[in-house]
Amino acid sequence: MNKWTKISIELASKGNYLDQLFAVYPTIPDKKRKINSEIIEKIKKYFKSKNNKELFSILIKLELFPIKDSYVAYFKRSSNSLQYNPDQLKRICNRIYEISLETLLEKIVEPKETNRQIGPMFKNWIKKTTFCLPKLDIVDFDKQKNGIMIASDDQMKNYAKKNFNYTPNKGLDFIAKKEGKFLIGETKFLTDFGGHQNAQFNDAINVFKSGAKNCEFIAIMDGVVYIQRGKLYNSFLNENKNFSIFSALVLDQFLKEFK
């Protein structure tokens, strides 16, 4: 197994891993969503009068629909379908009436799920953390032998395509160089086991299969992946034991030893 993966596993199993990780991924619930008071009053009115069409027409335009239902997304993307599918409209509205008006009003202003906020957190942590290498914008990065690039996912992707023949059409999370040697990487915070999280793992691993030239690859991963005897640990880490997969918490140590 890769040295840095071993260090990450030890850190996760013996140290205050989660307390330290919170500095990288501070998953603090967002503020409640704001909805215009006039819209709230209309929702109350149509809920009480059980005006299915008007109530649904308002709710479907909000960021967050009050209930989970497989047919809602279709209605969101096809406004005409509302008039042609009265049975589904009635069924969904009956489900909404069952949760009560008070619950409905709470549901539509719920904060964004923290797992939807995770994306930018790693880069924010990079910006505010001191590393052994200087942090440079994309222009200054080319002028120096050493540095960590501060740029958007798309800027990093385009840079990697131009300089390393990087082929995937998705953004990158990390680019650095030391004494002229380049590193590119993906980051993931795997919060649980399951299909989506497995896909996230594979998404990060794909950086090693990107076909990029003249650079080395890293996958900066955190979360349940380091739980020994866990599903991800057994089926993925063992299969990818030769890759540089490690926690964000050991990134600076890795960069210090990178040659």
Model regions: which residues?
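Domain-level recognition of nuclease-like catalytic cores that cleave nucleotide substrates
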Residues: 219-259
